[in-house]
Amino acid sequence: MRLAVIAGDGIGPEVITEALKVLDAVLPGVEKTEYDLGARQYHKTGEVLPDSVLEELKGHDAILLGAIGDPSVPSGLLERGLLLRIRFELDHHINLRPARLYPGVQSPLAGNPEIDFVVVREGTEGPYTGNGGAIRVGTPHEIATEVSVNTAFGVRRAVQDAFGRAQQRRKHLTLVHKNNVLTNAGSLWWRTVQTVAAEYPDVEVAYQHVDAATIHMVTDPGRFDVIVTDNLFGDIITDLAAAVCGGIGLAASGNIDATLTHPSMFEPVHGSAPDIAGQGIADPTAAVMSVSLLLAHMAEVDAAARVDKAVAEHLATRGDEKLSTAAVGERILGKL
């Protein structure tokens, strides 16, 4: 496996260091290339992601990212110039966000209910395509528009991916949308789900408006197995899903090209946390979870299962103990 490593900003390098130790333990011999992308690269060169580096990234099998963002750089510049550019250039049309409440982790929900579902979020369409504009800016007659783009092709491949995952899990898929108001896009999504469902007769299908889904994530999260949704709704509900499972510090994500034409990218959901960077106190658990997602995507199923098991055992016995970044990494390595 040829792996591109982008440690990034803030606590990114610290958590990625521990994640790579785990990767090396379960899959020795991975060929790693490190790329210094983020605030340092921007301040040094004025570029966020040079074209030549993007071409190099395309030659790898997968990408592991730490975190991007720094207060010394204008807000959104790194995110758009690096994360979104990689997503669109490498056709990361699936954003995969597992949501699992591990034993030993305290949920804000009463009674620590059983939570184990996956959100499949379409990653390259919706209102995030930059299709919009503004006129008469700064006047009382300003008009601003953001157009949500939904194509039959894009919706179909997200729905197809979600059904495939549901087939391998508990065989239940929920479409989350708002088709009573967003009638055009909502109709396309629902008709696509119904069409693809015919290929998976043993997968039960449900629909929920996005506002109802947020309620049920809090009151009855056990009803969900696989959720499929568009880019905007997915962006919102995945953070809620992380919150009920103990917080974004325990959330991993995959930005996936399901066709395997381009390398997919895996990262912890948390940010760069510049306020604690360099102190050795950042929790690398989510970065290690990202390694598990990466391994599963690369069909290294046994290695992924070993990492999952080690993380689960670590969380089950950790309690409220405050541990350093390195100590958490050592504990997870020990569980292997």
UniProtKB/Swiss-Prot annotation:
The record marks 128, 178 as: Important for catalysis. Its main location: cytoplasm. Substrate binds at residues 87, 97, 121, 211. Its cofactor is Mg(2+); Mn(2+). Binds 1 Mg(2+) or Mn(2+) ion per subunit. Belongs to the isocitrate and isopropylmalate dehydrogenases family. LeuB type 2 subfamily. This is 3-isopropylmalate dehydrogenase. The lineage of its organism: Bacteria, Bacillati, Actinomycetota, Actinomycetes, Mycobacteriales. The gene is leuB.
